[in-house]
Design a protein with these regions (language model features):
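Conserved non-catalytic scaffold segment of RNase H-like nuclease domains
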Residues: 1-116, 129-142
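Histidine/lysine/aspartate-rich catalytic loop segments that bind and position anionic ligands
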Residues: 115-124
Length: 142
């Protein structure tokens, strides 16, 4: 059995070095290349403001996030969902970097790579379509 979790995040900005945080995690489970119907989705209060540029991309406002749980309160449930799976992520270093940044703020958590394999679909797209746009919108149009 091959268990994969297709994952995406939204964030307050682009840089963990500026303490930007995850504000949304969405995942679907795939077993043997078939959707199982299991998913994980959570909006997260980042305990900081969302940069205007990021808000223009994803449309998630500070007001909407104000009553959402903080990452620490959902970390166990999220880790349980992804543990042991191969994560499939477009531009994986970005998402994994943010997930590791969030786990790094907590006690007794280790990096994602200790729990999961990671496949980066952006790397795959660049190999298959060199010199072309390989963002998700461009790939969906092909």
């Amino acid at each position: 059995m091959v268990r994969q979790v297709v994952l995406d995040t939204e964030t307050t900005g682009l840089e963990t070095s500026q303490d930007h945080r995850i504000i949304e995690i969405g995942c679907v489970e795939v077993v043997n290349r078939r959707l199982t119907g299991r998913h994980y989705h959570q909006y997260i209060n980042p305990e900081r403001g969302v940069d205007q540029g990021a808000m223009e991309v994803h449309g998630i406002t500070n007001e909407y996030l104000a009553d959402k749980p903080v990452f620490a309160s959902v970390a166990d449930e999220f880790l349980e969902f992804i543990k042991g799976a191969e994560l499939v992520i477009h531009n994986a270093p970005f998402d994994v970097g943010f997930i590791d940044h969030e786990f790094g703020k907590l006690d007794d958590y280790s990096p994602v790579a200790t729990h999961c394999g990671v496949t980066d679909t952006l790397v795959m797209a660049r190999q298959r379509h060199p010199g072309q746009k390989n963002n998700l919108d461009a790939l969906c149009k092909r």
